[in-house]
Amino acid sequence: MSDSPEMQPASPSDVVSTHEFQRDLPEEPENAPTPGGDEDHNEEAPEEGAASATPAAESVAETHEDDPADKEDAGVDSDEESILSEVDEAQFEDFDPENVDIEDRPQLAIDEDNLKLIGRHKRKRTEEDGQQVKRKREGRREKKNRRRDMEEGLDEGEDKSRRRDRKKRDATPEDEELLDPATRRRRALDRAMDEALKKPTKRRFRKADGIDLEQMADAEIEDMRKRMTHAAQMDANNRREGRPAMHKLKMLPEVVSLLNRNQYVNSLVDPEINLLEAVKFFLEPLDDGSLPAYNIQRDLMTALSKLPINKETLIASGIGKVIVFYTKSKRPEPGIKRMAERLLAEWTRPILQRSDDYSKRVYQEAEYDPSPHAHKYYRKLTTRTTSAQASVAEARSRELLPPRLANRARPEITHTSYTIVPRPTVVQESKFARPLGASGEDRFRRMRARQIAASKGSRR
């Protein structure tokens, strides 16, 4: 009868390892209380006796089988032994470490100078490393070409437009009659909002339903010119007969609404139609020298300030003469007079070739020597302060005089505006000194440079 592996006697090495393993394990207390009570303890007693009767080799084998760490250590040792087993130990029998040819060189202290003498050696790759997938090297990046990008953008735009046209042809229009009233109203509102938000197009010089709008505008302006001329003649006749002149006042709202229409701007200032001549008839004084109503002056001058009137229009209409009359006459209101001066300056500036930029404006200069006036002033002061008693007596006698036209206090007449600029007499000590106001010019120059840079950035 052959012995089974479980009943074979343990070897001495197994016994030693078993003793070491048992020494490491913690000692379990005998007669430990169990949760099940005495009955469970009595039932487990025979099993413990049977386990103690088993050989030590069986317990050692079970512990080694249950411990995975021991298996891993054993696997590592076996791998190392397999690698070393391939080396031929016979070739190292004649090796003598004392006969190795090593050059005797003096030891050097490593510093910044001789640190660069250490060579660099690249590690040689093995066949296994060569079999690994090499990292794909990034190629050279192409520079951006604006012209090529524009061409590609145009091609893409053409493709998109073709695709969009194809979709439009394929799509079938939805019948709105099948929709409920709320949906139809919502879609109508959306269409109206889209049309309102679209960029406005030029509506001048086009035809709508076979009607030439330009010709229609010219006819309307010509009719208004004739009516305005007739109204001015009727007011002049009524004024001669002593009746109130009301025809121009009745037509004033229609005239102002026509002058404020932006789509008729070119026709309004056209010298051939010459509507501004009728406006001149409304603004000029009547035969008896009386001025037109204040409402006519204010509304028409406000409308004239918005029109681009040029030299040809001024010559054909003659309205500039009426504006000059309002600037020189004393009868118009101050507000009307200022509006007339503003119109005259705006119309004469391109004729006189003057710029509206105040930084480029040229002022008339004149020299002024205050020394003679100062000498007269000091002489008066000396004559007045000859004696304190005389001055006090003079002041007392002046106060006791009866009130007359000569001894009343009046505000002195001074110039409110100046047209001649005094010539500067400041002498610079050094030619490298900065002139007065240079800091303001530098600040303006920097602000202008920032605006130009911002505009260039927005274009990109």
UniProtKB/Swiss-Prot annotation:
Residues 277-354 form the TFIIS N-terminal domain. Residues 133-147 have a biased composition (Basic residues). Its main location: nucleus. GO terms for biological process: poly(A)+ mRNA export from nucleus. It is found in: Nucleus. Pfam families: Med26. Residues 48-60 have a biased composition (Low complexity). Keywords: Nucleus, Transcription, Transcription regulation. Residues 64-101 have a biased composition (Acidic residues). Residues 1-16 have a biased composition (Polar residues). Residues 1-186 are annotated as: Disordered. Coiled coil: none annotated. PANTHER family: PROTEIN IWS1 HOMOLOG. Transcription factor involved in RNA polymerase II transcription regulation. May function in both SPT15/TBP post-recruitment and recruitment steps of transcription. Belongs to the IWS1 family. This is Transcription factor iws1. It comes from Aspergillus fumigatus (strain ATCC MYA-4609 / CBS 101355 / FGSC A1100 / Af293). The gene is iws1.
